[in-house]
């Protein structure tokens, strides 16, 4: 069997396409790299979706924590505190058993007991909390002269946020935010050691 045949048979195995049984003999380097690459499909799925959706929530959390309204500051602060103050691995276990309990009363929540939705939700909340704190720090570090210049030009509200505050916040937060993005992709491997059942995981364990 050539390496191209191995890739065709096992390249998409992690998402349920191709050969289901692992090879029992002649386990070559091509087999190993193909199976590792197949598993990375899920890492890319979790990392990309959690990062893009978490970015939006992180921006809202940063704005909420910097808001003059007390309830927004408290809600944002507690959300960030809970997800930054507890280990991600514990969050996976807690969320899984919480979703199992809720599924009995709310059947539409049943997808959250699977890794593709439930683990993604946990990663989404976790990266949003960490990124939200990073963005909040960047908001506090925006030079007052930039805001005064925006006021001098007559900018206010959303216009000032879109043209001055948001770009400056991203520029200041970018180094720390890229570190968080790298950490998130590393953390996606924890999904397969958590309680959330993933495709092929049970079959491989029996095999």
Language model features: what each stretch is:
Residues 1-207:
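Transmembrane alpha-helices and adjacent helix-loop boundaries
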């Amino acid at each position: 069997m050539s390496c191209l045949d191995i890739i065709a048979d096992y390249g998409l195995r992690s998402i349920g396409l191709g050969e289901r049984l692992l090879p029992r003999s002649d386990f070559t380097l091509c087999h190993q790299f193909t199976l590792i690459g197949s598993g990375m499909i899920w890492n890319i799925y979790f990392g990309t979706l959690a990062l893009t959706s978490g970015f939006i929530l992180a921006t809202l959390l940063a704005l909420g924590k910097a808001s003059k309204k007390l309830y927004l500051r408290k809600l944002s602060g507690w959300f960030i505190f809970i997800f930054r103050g507890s280990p991600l691995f514990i969050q996976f276990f807690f969320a899984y058993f919480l979703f199992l309990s809720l599924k009995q009363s709310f059947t539409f929540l049943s997808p959250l007991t699977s890794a593709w939705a439930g683990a993604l939700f946990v990663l989404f909340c976790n990266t949003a909390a960490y990124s939200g704190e990073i963005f909040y720090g960047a908001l506090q570090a925006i030079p007052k002269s930039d805001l005064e210049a925006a006021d001098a030009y007559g900018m206010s509200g959303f216009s000032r946020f879109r043209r001055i505050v948001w770009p400056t916040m991203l520029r200041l937060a970018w180094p720390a935010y890229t570190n968080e993005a790298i950490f998130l992709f590393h953390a996606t491997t924890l999904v397969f050691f958590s309680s959330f059942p993933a495709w092929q995981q049970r079959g491989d364990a029996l095999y």
